[in-house]
Amino acid sequence: MLTNDRTVGKIRVSVIEKAVAAGRSTMEKINTRDEILKVALDLFSVNGYEATSISQIADAVGIRKASLYSHFSSKQEILDNVVAAVLTGYDNHSIFANTNWDDPEFTKDKQGMTAEDAAGMIQSQVRRILHDPAISKGRKMLMIEQFRNKELADLQTRVNYEDIIRYFEGMIRFLVRMNKLKESDTEIMAAQLSSPITVWINLCDREPSREEEVMELVHKHVLQFFEIYAK
């Protein structure tokens, strides 16, 4: 009986060890997959998709090219997963994607919004755009690829134009309702408010040392906008 108990015990230990090994292998595979996507985004944001090879990605990760294909079947699949990850992060964290200025729950603490409040809120989002690695690299990748890839061009239009205009239009309509701003063409007002900020963000991409200068420009620009359209 003792022998049988020992045998059963050994079998149980063996099963547990195999399960642990399998779990470790799965985690390692997931970690490698995530690292491939991270490295691919790094390379795509600098060199572009076309100029980046599978070999370059594998070398940067520290694996063989053949090993990379056990995680992704092609460079296109890597790109698809990179874009999906960037878009998920954007949808989850960007105020431009998530904010609804017609939602009373969102606006209930913004009834007394001042020009300074708006400037601070916008400056905070600009810093996030500049310093969140996924957002920053994703933007740069889209800028490079928008002329080669229709899907990415459409995504670029959405995240760097449509969502931004929609956000600022919503904010302006809200401020008009609160009698903070006078009524005018809200789409044009949104473009007037957001377009210089977009230009300054692009300037920071090229010349990071000018960030504080840009922050001051954003602050003065928002205050002047409120001054011009004040009711």
Label the model's feature ranges.
Residues 89-93, 97, 149, 167, ...:
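A short secondary-structure junction motif
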